[in-house]
Amino acid sequence: MTRITLRPIASPMPLGFFTVAIASVMTGCLQLGILEAPERRAVALCVLPAFALQFLVSILAFGARDVIAATLMGTFAGSWLAYALVMGTGAAGGPKVLGVFNLAFLCFGALMAAVTRPKRALWFVLVVSLPRWAATGLAGLTGEQWLTQTAGALGLVVGLVATYAAFALMLEDMRGEEVLPIGRSGPAHHAVEGDLSVQLRNLERHAGVRRTL
């Protein structure tokens, strides 16, 4: 007889979204000029812990069998590390390099948005992040100040949406039911509202149980 052990954990997603919110607000304030250019290294140091926090969320999400959340949070972690290192060290050509990086991230985000719609919290954060990555990327390549300020304003919007998502998911995990609307649908809705049989469906085909990835 083969036994498969499942261990309940607290949802790591509130931590992930709160981290996105705080880091987005910090970088947005720098882009808007609320924080001056000489303070960019201090901003980079404030953003650097976001890498560790979101990397932790990614690991926990993999353990919770949520490949979409794990992939997104892991990639977000890498993006904060790249930003912090480039801005903190004042590397030559940093804005232009980060511009290309953000446009590449935009392509990744668009692909992920196509598969995350049932998970509305992730989807909404992605949807508001896409124009910010576009504006940040173009600002880095062109040096246009209005694009930088637009990206900064969008960063504050991302912070608001991510804060709502984090708070709603934290309340849900604490009370064991949806308190604030998140808008799950399809498999994501059934995973929360369904019984144990829904959670165990096709378990033998999941990574870590099947023979190969």
Spell out what each predicted region is.
Residues 36-51, 90-104, 125-126, 152-156:
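Structural signature of hydrophobic alpha-helical transmembrane segments
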Residues 24-31, 55-58, 78-90, 108-113, ...:
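Hydrophobic alpha-helical transmembrane segments and adjacent interfacial helices
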Residues 100-111, 121-141, 147-168:
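Alpha-helical membrane segments in multi-pass integral membrane proteins
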Residues 174-183:
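Short, Lys/Arg-enriched, Gly/Pro-containing loop segments at transmembrane-helix junctions
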Residues 88-95, 114-121, 142-146:
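Membrane-interface helix caps and helix-loop-helix hairpins in membrane proteins
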Residues 1-55, 186-213:
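N-terminal topogenic module of multi-pass integral membrane proteins
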Residues 60-70, 113-125:
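Membrane-helix interface "capping/anchor" motifs
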Residues 37-74, 81:
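Early transmembrane hairpin module of multi-pass membrane proteins
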